Amino acid sequence: MSNRVKTSIESKLFAFLMFLFLTGIESGAQTDSLYMYLDSTTLSIRRHSSAIKNNDSGATTINTGMIQSLPKIFGNTDPVNFIRQLPGVQTNSEFDSGIHIQGCDNSHNLISIGNIPVYGSNHLLGLFSAFIPSHHEKMTFSTSAGFANRLGGKLDMELTDTLKKPVSGEFSAGLISSQGTLRMRIGKKHHLKISTRGSYMNLLYKRWMQIAGSPIKYGFGDGNLTWLYADGKDRIWADFYFGADKTHMAEKTFDVDLGLIWGNAMGALHWERAGTDVRQKHSIYYTGFLSDCDVSQSSSSLNMTSFISTAGYKGQVNWLNISAGADLAYHMIQPQSPQLHGIIGADNNIQEQQACGEAYTYIRYKRIFADRWTATAGLKASGYLSPEGRLYGDISPEASIMYDIFKYGKIKAEYNLGRQYLFQTGISNIGFPLEFWFAAGKYSKPQRSHNISLSYNANFLHEALAVSASVYYKKLYNQVQYVGSLFDFFSSRYDLHDHLLNGRGWNYGVNLMVHKQSGSLTGWISYSLGRSLRKFDNQGYAGIYPANHERIHELNATASYKLRKWDLGGTFVYASGQPFTAPEYFYMSSGQILTVYGKHNGCRMRPYIRLDLSVTYSFIKNEMQENGINLSVYNALARHNDVMYRISKEDNVYSYKAFSFFIQLMPSISYYHKF
């Protein structure tokens, strides 16, 4: 080939690459492929149209705008429910609103907005999370919480760093809830984003919202406000979140009236400076959660109040391949403290408020060598002051090494020693947030865990297909589980010590996933095999037991198909049943039911199977605006999935039986508009 011909081809290739750069094909293209003709040569670039993007650190970045092409249950694709479709994240029943990552408890995970923790990240029944999807453009998910004082994973809703339009927004209105987001640029340097949401589930589903004939009333509202100041290298955010829930249930079997209100709030001020080699970020914040429960039965009543509030500082500096940071947090905690009224001889053992503090500093170094190898090593020094005034000091290392096989993928091995000084426990399987926090100290020593994992990730067919596999093992120390039921508060003197099982645990498993990332049809199939086992030191609990949330097998399938103005989506899940403790017998004494339980977590519910479907039609979709209508069906198979076991009374005969979610098939329709 002559030099002249080579020069001509090189010039055209350079022009083609410049065209790609200027048009931003990776993020802005609206078609799945881009074709450009160079004489008789055709080049094709396939667009990555999946919402999920993995990086070498092990974290997964998720575009919250793109996940809206997946099933819109009740009008939108909830970020937390989306995460539960990924391998290693457990599917929950409607009466368990937590997140369980690689077999860990819900409290082991760091759920945050802009890296600021949010307590109580789900509304009632787990159908809605605390996050309004339209307020957050991206979220980051990892099966490891990094250097944070958590034993599990991390889910962070990222802060917006810019607004593309002077004014934009979106809203949706449906049969169950409505939400809206408004974005404004105020001048050249100020940006404002406001979001709000409210539910009115009772209007449509009132007649079906019952548990064993007992009606339930429920409503919630939440909102976000984010102000951003951007000036050159500096950015300042003021970020706020609030949420409030209220529910009431009139239980007919035992003539129990239950009322519950709870809410959470978060406020933070962030400053970030991005230099040529150095990037730093500093945050001060407050975050809290409150739960207030009132239960009445005949002439007696019970009040249970608990809360946690945290004020703190976070700082981080990145310089070349080195990152370092510090975290300070002060906690005020009220563990669950039942107060009985109307019962002769009632002895209210008031649980004292707890004040404690924790701090840590860390450094991490990353090194790439021999082209194919990437090694990371870090060290964290942490300190904790318990409510009793005892000081704990700990050192926690972490290390990882990754080998790049180029077109055949990457293999990564990781180890870290985790620490955690806060506990969350309580009655978790009745659909109401009766769990509470308490600090390490007199009830239990600080938690720690050894975490080992090995993972493989690869892209094939020009990144159209992604394959991943991982194995993990966690050894956990100083674990707790709550035992007992709501009726125990009426029949005996309450002491938190009597309801806590203390011991150690093991989590291990395998996760597999095949993911189609581009084209009109995208989605994935994943399978997880995992065990979450606990061994307790308490008398009468010899042996090894499954954790309350354990599901041994789980299969997830997610698909989204685009056809012009139509978006079709579906998700399917099959999960093994969760364990529960069945009673050996129960009897009446002075009008109260006393229960004698059998082997702890010795029984299992039936497998959980659910299919969700969604159809979205866009009336108008262009650069200026978009509007359309969505029809979704939750649990399209109308399967009666067990969500809990409880005592039932029929024709004056008492039995212990399974109950399913009060609505088997839940359709919903909503209208949305974006501008």
Question: What kind of region is each of these model predictions?
Answer:
Residues 44-48, 54-109, 113-145, 154, ...:
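Periplasmic N-terminal accessory/gating domains of Gram-negative outer-membrane beta-barrel systems
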Residues 100, 110, 138-146, 152-160, ...:
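Predominantly transmembrane beta-strands of Gram-negative outer membrane beta-barrel pores used
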Residues 150, 191-200, 277-296, 334-341, 354-387, 403, 407-452, 464, ...:
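Surface-exposed extracellular loop regions of Gram-negative outer-membrane beta-barrel proteins
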Residues 201, 214-218, 233-308, 346-349, ...:
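Flexible loop and strand-edge segments within Gram-negative outer membrane beta-barrel domains
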Residues 306-312, 350-362, 462-526, 554, ...:
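Outer membrane beta-barrel strand-and-loop segments of large Gram-negative receptors
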Residues 473-475, 498-584:
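Gram-negative outer-membrane beta-barrel transporters
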Residues 574-591, 609-610, 617-675:
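C-terminal beta-signal and adjacent terminal beta-strands/loops
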